[in-house]
Amino acid sequence: MARDIGLNIPAPSEECDDAYCPFHGTLPVRGQILVGTVVSSKMDNTVVIERQYMKMVSKYQRYEKRRSKIHAHNPACISAKVGDIVTIVECRPISKTKSFVVVKAEVPK
């Protein structure tokens, strides 16, 4: 049985026994909610998400493209793949580089 994580995101249909799953485990989520694209899923239960955004350069009064990469935990019930558009939520630090967890994955159109 999936628990309510406090967001308007439906629980995944699959069950998992991951302790770090916000739906089936005991991991509380809080803080930032971000959307990005999965660029790597080679690590065990981890995905790398890339976010692209525009930054204003005040000297030239123009915008420049920037990007950032974030490591996030990928529960077995969600199992996001490369190219998926995912929603990640901040949580407590899971490891040295992971402080986010994937809560929703969509296949791009």
From Swiss-Prot:
The protein's name in its UniProt record: Small ribosomal subunit protein uS17
Family statement drawn from the similarity comment of this UniProt entry: Belongs to the universal ribosomal protein uS17 family.
Domain of life: Archaea
Family matches, as HAMAP family: Ribosomal_uS17_A
GO cellular component, one term: cytosolic small ribosomal subunit
Cystine crosslinks: none
Record's function text: One of the primary rRNA binding proteins, it binds specifically to the 5'-end of 16S ribosomal RNA.
